Swiss-Prot record:
Keyword Transmembrane: yes
Alphabetical UniProt keywords: Cell membrane, Membrane, Transmembrane, Transmembrane helix
A Gene Ontology term for the protein's cellular component: plasma membrane
Subcellular location: Cell membrane
InterPro entries registered for this protein in UniProt: DUF986
Membrane topology label: Multi-pass membrane protein
Family: To M.jannaschii MJ0803.
First-listed, main subcellular location of the protein, grouped into a coarse class: membrane
Organism field: Methanocaldococcus jannaschii (strain ATCC 43067 / DSM 2661 / JAL-1 / JCM 10045 / NBRC 100440) (Methanococcus jannaschii)
Transmembrane segments: 58-78, 81-101
Protein known as: Uncharacterized protein MJ0696
């Protein structure tokens, strides 16, 4: 049963790292055109994040209730005493889920700069953006396809920004500027 405690500690460390990464401020190296405040989940998923923002706390609640119910079931049905390590592991897992939810359920600043887009600890250069599309009140920026492990699998990066004409004009002008340089 001690192995579950190690897993819970690893999960807790992972959630702290995720929280720390999402709270990092970017080190901007060029002129800022526009700063956009945006929800982190919307930046990653666009309109689909609206469902996630509502469903995630409910899902975490069900998982916590299931975890506690499982221990009660073990104790009542099988007369199996619940060890202190399993209780500590459950508490650490619950704390980890709360930390992860706090990390992803917040607004962050996205900076449209002269050389690319900065947010959290990430930087996306204008030359790495392949396509721009308007979709459901968002501007979708598609990154260039990257091969994974030299195979036929590709990783397609995309981010979503709130639709605004000024933002759209900045993005299109910068992409054209970087395409002309190449």
């Amino acid at each position: 049963m001690e192995s579950i405690l190690f897993i819970a500690i690893a999960f807790l460390i992972n959630s702290f790292i995720s929280y720390k990464i999402t709270n990092m401020q970017p080190k901007i190296k060029s002129r800022i055109f526009k700063r956009v405040k945006m929800h982190y989940l919307n930046l990653i998923e666009g309109k689909k994040a609206e469902f996630d923002k509502k469903a995630m706390p409910i899902l975490f609640g069900f998982m916590i209730i299931a975890l506690i119910s499982f221990n009660i079931l073990l104790y009542v049905v099988y007369n199996c005493p619940v060890s202190i390590t399993s209780i500590i592991a459950e508490i650490l897992i619950i704390i980890s889920m709360i930390i992860i939810w706090k990390a992803f359920n917040k607004e962050i600043s996205v900076y449209l700069c002269d050389d690319g887009i900065y947010y959290s600890n990430k930087f996306i250069s204008w030359k790495n953006i392949e396509n721009v599309k308007k979709d459901d009140g968002f501007i979708v920026l598609f990154g260039k396809k990257k091969k994974i492990l030299g195979r036929k699998l590709y990783l397609l990066q995309r981010i979503y920004l709130k639709y605004d004409e000024e933002i759209e004009n900045i993005i299109k002008n910068q992409i054209e500027k970087f395409r002309d340089k190449a």
